[in-house]
Amino acid sequence: MSCVHYKFSSKLNYDTVTFDGLHISLCDLKKQIMGREKLKAADSDLQITNAQTKEEYTDDNALIPKNSSVIVRRIPIGGVKSTSKTYVISRTEPVMGTTKAIDDASASISLAQLTKTANLAEANASEEDKIKAMMSQSGHEYDPINYMKKTLVGPPPPSYTCFRCGKPGHYIKNCPTNGDKNFESGPRIKKSTGIPRSFMMEVKDPNMKGAMLTNTGKYAIPTIDAEAYAIGKKEKPPFLPEEPSSSSEEDDPIPDELLCLICKDIMTDAVVIPCCGNSYCDECIRTALLESDEHTCPTCHQNDVSPDALIANKFLRQAVNNFKNETGYTKRLRKQLPPPPPPVPPPRPLMQRNLQPLMRSPISRQQDPLMIPVTSSSAHSAPSISSLTSNPSALAPSVSGNPSSAPAPVPDITATVSISVHSEKSDGPFRDSDNKLLPAAALTSEHSKGASSIAITALMEEKGYQVPVLGTPSLLGQSLLHGQLIPTTGPVRINAARPGGGRPGWEHSNKLGYLVSPPQQIRRGERSCYRSINRGRHHSERSQRTQGPSLPATPVFVPVPPPPLYPPPPHTLPLPPGVPPPQFSPQFPPGQPPPAGYSVPPPGFPPAPANISTPWVSSGVQTAHSNTIPTTQAPPLSREEFYREQRRLKEEEKKKSKLDEFTNDFAKELMEYKKIQKERRRSFSRSKSPYSGSSYSRSSYTYSKSRSGSTRSRSYSRSFSRSHSRSYSRSPPYPRRGRGKSRNYRSRSRSHGYHRSRSRSPPYRRYHSRSRSPQAFRGQSPTKRNVPQGETEREYFNRYREVPPPYDIKAYYGRSVDFRDPFEKERYREWERKYREWYEKYYKGYAVGAQPRPSANREDFSPERLLPLNIRNSPFTRGRREDYAAGQSHRNRNLGGNYPEKLSTRDSHNAKDNPKSKEKESENVPGDGKGNKHKKHRKRRKGEESESFLNPELLETSRKCRESSGIDETKTDTLFVLPSRDDATPVRDEPMDAESITFKSVSDKDKREKDKPKVKSDKTKRKSDGSATAKKDNVLKPSKGPQEKVDGDREKSPRSEPPLKKAKEEATKIDSVKPSSSSQKDEKVTGTPRKAHSKSAKEHQEAKPAKDEKVKKDCSKDIKSEKPASKDEKAKKPEKNKLLDSKGEKRKRKTEEKSVDKDFESSSMKISKVEGTEIVKPSPKRKMEGDVEKLERTPEKDKIASSTTPAKKIKLNRETGKKIGNAENASTTKEPSEKLESTSSKIKQEKVKGKAKRKVAGSEGSSSTLVDYTSTSSTGGSPVRKSEEKTDTKRTVIKTMEEYNNDNTAPAEDVIIMIQVPQSKWDKDDFESEEEDVKTTQPIQSVGKPSSIIKNVTTKPSATAKYTEKESEQPEKLQKLPKEASHELMQHELRSSKGSASSEKGRAKDREHSGSEKDNPDKRKSGAQPDKESTVDRLSEQGHFKTLSQSSKETRTSEKHESVRGSSNKDFTPGRDKKVDYDSRDYSSSKRRDERGELARRKDSPPRGKESLSGQKSKLREERDLPKKGAESKKSNSSPPRDKKPHDHKAPYETKRPCEETKPVDKNSGKEREKHAAEARNGKESSGGKLPCIPNPPDPPMEKELAAGQVEKSAVKPKPQLSHSSRLSSDLTRETDEAAFEPDYNESDSESNVSVKEEEAVASISKDLKEKTTEKAKESLTVATASQPGADRSQSQSSPSVSPSRSHSPSGSQTRSHSSSASSAGSQDSKKKKKKKEKKKHKKHKKHKKHKKHAGADGDVEKSQKHKHKKKKAKKNKDKEKEKDDQKVRSVTV
């Protein structure tokens, strides 16, 4: 389109008219313009002039070329000569009105005449003319012609005098002097008309300025004018260039911190440059950067500083706005005033360079603008540098460049030393630049005085400008750098990223108090800002302002603050006010570098401290905290001194500039904000208090917080990344410390938490985020938690969660805390007291020896804490976690290591971590991290879960809502973001909550605390952790399978073992598991929450959604409860427990060994100690088991919570894996739970106490872990595929039970939390053997994996079923593999490869059939809930077994191959590794059990001839299922009377006792599972070891019976196995580990309960089987042969057995898949066993109830589980029938 640009002469801008063509006519242009401008053609005409040529267009037809610019004027119609004021229309005289009417009515009057006609109506003219005339007349008076005054025409009035010559007689225009250039008229004298004389002042000189002539003839001027003239009024035209005025600038000088270093004027749009942290005008710095060739920073001269990296300095901008508002200052050309800061920049750059890397923010923190006087800044910078240089020795390592800054901060940081240094440095530097340093000096004194809070306040107030600078980067940087800079420097993590670390909590508080908001801002977006701010100005200017920067200079980074917090309450006391002394290692004088023990790495590099190798900063921090900080504590100001200092500083601040006032106001606002936050924190603190109150809780809770702290330490720089780092930095050191220390660390974190500023986010947030408090805290601030707890809040909360008694927010952010205020003082003292008590209570105990040690225990908590933080907040955390996944970081960071690994595995390690994750996760599965954390969690969860489990539905609902809103946000943020956090710090966000782990831990905790759904979420997390690996990759899923195997073993052992033993064992297991993998975490969640699961499961049965997840939890709980119940039930069961424990421990150990092999050694320092013994001493299995049991005892409570959380995890995994799976699991869990409950109700009286709980526990534990797979599988996808699909979305977080329990946050949907259940010695031995087996069976697993994949691909309807089958196969295989591993490792390798292929083919076939059936139901009810899922699995397994039996016939053939491939591949996957690990464990214990079971089964398995073909398939399947079966047979063999007898004998009498079988199945669910697992294992062994035996068909009846028995076991065990088998791929091992395959989250509640029972049975059987392992090992081959036929028959009878099995639980699905084999065992047997299983379940439920009662929620959970079990039972019965039909079809098919 062509266009012409026009503008009215009165307008500034051109408008455009568009037209077609090259030209537009003038007429058209006028029309368009009038149309656009809404002008009326009658109103005026338009005069168009060419804007360039000034040519006026007059011809309407003139063509104006396109793209011309024209100027438009409105002119009257008819036009006006542009230069003339006379109208074009000639008129004699203006016709006013009708004065001169034209009376001659000629026939046609001219228009000119007509316009003068008065009576137009009678005029002789056309109407148009009349109208025109009328218009003209009406507007004539307004005609420009009439504008001229007539008086100028003709002789003027006699009184008129010419204005030019002053003579009368002519107008000025006619003045004769007009042409006289030499004429000068005298001054014109005005008359004072209208001005009252009273306002006038007579003057004599008429020439006086403003003189006027009065009516009296005298001259006068207005009085006010005279006064103004006397003063010399400067009236300037508005737009004249201003003369540089000295008045307002001088009167109200701009604070230097508000001055741009470049333009020397007040900053506009202040931005922080990341390199040195200085602030400039946005335009100035951008111009400077762009004008420099290499984008060189004008201050620090760093090259390649991208203008895009500039961070808006919101605080400084606010300060500038406030300054402008207060002073009315308008930006003037102030560039003339080059401030002295230029010198500062050089030193500052120096500092900045040194500090820049280390303390970037501090030094650079804009020495100039931030420094009150730029000169001061420079001077200060220099002195700071010098003094800092003195400090540099101390700071140099970390913050060489921060010396100058450090000195100032030093005073802040080190109270005493700080003061001297501060006064000396601050005053020196500030006073050096005295002009502007006055504020700086005040600041300095402020710093020296109240290096803590007042320092910040003073600094901020004194350097109000700094508030702006600190505001975002500078303020925060200051505070962060002061308190946090150290960590910042320490980890370089974000210079201030580790606010908690660098600025001790308090300095953070003080500086952050002032900077609280900034920290948050910084956390969010200003980390770099902080770095830059802190770097740039922080050290010099900011240091002055905020002594903290100096501290950051000290490498004593963050960790120091925490120590002061807890290690030295006195020190912390002075410190909290904002004193950052702890920032230096307080022990170290500001000038001294922290001692090696402190191991403060250069700020940029947190070293693995001597004490704590993993947390880069952690150990140093911890050491420093415990040791150095105490030393420095003395130097830090005493409270009185501190208050005095602060008072003095405040007074000085009051003297400061308005900017300071503004800053103070700003700080006050911040303080208010912090107060709110602090109160929240207190709230959290209170809730935390319970943890503090409870030693365990504290240990675990503190651990969690410690995790927060450790994580914080770890993420020091990340810490800046708002939440994780907080938590994270705190946690790593602590976690490294060990449990006690970990708690200490946490405590320390709490100490940190004094202001808990450490997290940048308000301390309260830390509490909030990290709140480890039980529901007390949670209940207290669930909403708070919810509300603020977005990601940041949670992160913050996590961050603060572990904070020791939190001081006031003011204290936290020092700035706002005015300790002069008696209230503040008192509050601070109170805080000190509390802190001291807290410290004495928690930290002191741990500080000495425990802190470093707790890595094993603490690691559980810490890693989780660390992980989220690490992953989320800090690349270090993330990277380190990954790097130290099992290594140094894994000790304390076992979780962390795991976490990063998991998260990393999830994200970065998705591909490589599939295998790596397998091993690592399996290694990590035994990781201690989880156990420890879960211990904490257990403790906390005991309270929490009591509350949590009380209202599972409500909690779950609210948690789900909350989680979906906040926790899922957080979860997604924390857990889900964990992956991203892994890759990128949030923020978590914000805030990380150290949310990755912190998120997980917190998420778990939050989930549990917030809701049972939270527990569910945690469970889901566990599941997710367990299945996170699987979801990460199916490879990871299998990896998770092994982890879950480990979990299963752990859970098994915990299940069987006494709750305390379980707790211990699970804690140990979890410890190993957590670092090892999400599976471990899940395991932990599963393991720890066994009790929790039982409680939860029972409650969850009431709340089906919650139920589902909680059923899983309950299964864990029940497993736990079942352990004692099982023991009570049978002595054999305790033996089984031992066996299972040892098996679990072995598996754990294997997993642990893997973990240790990878990075678990570090991570499993604790595990290494505990599990290391286990690993090293398989013989001391029981000893380790005892430890593990001890651990598990603690975790038991946590297990409840843990279990509960895994439900959610499972749900999340399911959601992620398959939303169908979610619904399916929920519904399946619900329905199967209900079914089981009803079935169990019948059986419950028999075995509910022992077996119901066990079943629940086993089911729960497995369920929680396996839920992932069930979710995946139930969801209708191969776990592998799902894992692969979810690999990116899901992250497997391995948490120790304690970590899991302590984790308040709801796991992100994408996060699978695997709870590491501490492995018993036996479990570890099993694990070791499993590890060998894994090595052996990994190929088989690899083969199995394709099966699952193929299954998924080949049988879409039975894809899930296949997957389930595969999962079942995998667990069976794994169980079998573990057994064989020790005895037939090589044979199994070779034969298992062959037999696995054949067996797995058969088994895969059956499983795939069951899987297909299961999956079809799963797919159908995929949308259903987990219980539905399992119910659907069962029902659809039954129905689908019918359908699938046909499709299974087809699919089975394909699935045989697929199963062989998938199963082998699956087994080859990490799941397989886990399976193998489990198998290894199972081999030793399970083999014995299996051999026993197989001997019994031999009786039952005459029809192995039938198994010949099916046997090979069954073998493969059993190779998977046998781990489960092995576990089952372990259980049933361990408790042969119950399980074996019912199962083994039932197998023979399977047909006779179909109905009976239901009860026995329930009863023997675990036993049968074990049997089934044992049989499967034996079958697997047969397939592996006795491949030839597989063809050896005993009798199809025997095989059927065996299969039925196995199926029944599988059914009993598979009940949970349904979802379990879904999860199986990943959780195969875990199911296998748990032999009871508790984790059928599809039937998570009932199945989980069954699983728990079964798992407990498996645990008991495990013990018995372990004892019998030798016998079984011998019999293993024979039994394996029988088992294989049994498996084959299981497959054939998979349908029949699946009916029962399915009715029972995922056992159907496992029996087909596992569930298939198990189901094959015989529908009657299945029914009998189901009954037994349900009896077991009920017993387990009873035991679970007892357990839950012990835990506080036992009754409710039991009720829930009973209800669920009933429903599940009902569904099971339905499923049984369906499965029977399906089994029959399958048998026909087979």
From Swiss-Prot:
Where is composition skewed (Acidic residues) in this entry? 1634-1646
Pathway assigned in UniProt: Protein modification; protein ubiquitination
Taxonomic classification, please? Answer: Eukaryota, Metazoa, Chordata, Craniata, Vertebrata
Q: What catalytic reaction does the record list?
A: S-ubiquitinyl-[E2 ubiquitin-conjugating enzyme]-L-cysteine + [acceptor protein]-L-lysine = [E2 ubiquitin-conjugating enzyme]-L-cysteine + N(6)-ubiquitinyl-[acceptor protein]-L-lysine
| Tissue note | Highly expressed in testis. Expressed at lower levels in brain, heart, kidney, liver, lung, skeletal muscle, spleen, thymus and tongue.
Q: Where is this chain compositionally biased, Polar residues type?
A: 622-635, 1260-1277, 1336-1358, 1618-1627
UniProt feature, compositional bias: Basic and acidic residues: 903-923, 956-972, 980-991, 1002-1018, 1042-1072, 1096-1161, 1182-1200, 1231-1249, 1281-1291, 1363-1392, 1400-1440, 1449-1460, 1469-1507, 1515-1580, 1663-1675, 1751-1760, 1774-1790
Here the segments flagged for biased composition (Basic residues) are: 736-771, 932-941, 1727-1750, 1761-1773
User: What are the residue boundaries of the DWNN domain, all occurrences included?
Assistant: 4-76
Q: Which residues carry this modification: Phosphothreonine?
A: 985, 1272, 1469
Compositional bias of kind Pro residues: 337-349, 558-599
Provide the protein's localization: Nucleus, Nucleolus; Chromosome; Cytoplasm, Cytoskeleton, Microtubule organizing center, Centrosome
Give the Gene Ontology MF terms in alphabetical order.
nucleic acid binding; protein kinase binding; ubiquitin protein ligase activity; ubiquitin-protein transferase activity; zinc ion binding
Q: Region entry Disordered: which residue ranges?
A: 329-353, 374-408, 533-599, 622-641, 648-667, 675-797, 850-1292, 1322-1790
Any one Pfam family here would be: U-box
- In its UniProt record, which GO terms are filed under biological process? DNA damage response; DNA replication; embryonic organ development; in utero embryonic development; mRNA processing; multicellular organism growth; protein ubiquitination; regulation of DNA replication
Subunit comment: Interacts with MDM2 and YBX1. Also interacts with p53/TP53 and RB1. Interacts with NEK6. Interacts with ZBTB38.
Instruction: Report residue spans for region: Interaction with RB1.
Output: 983-1139
List the protein's name.
E3 ubiquitin-protein ligase RBBP6
Q: Composition bias, kind Low complexity: at what positions?
A: 376-390, 686-720, 1689-1724
Which sequence positions carry the modification called N6-acetyllysine? 130
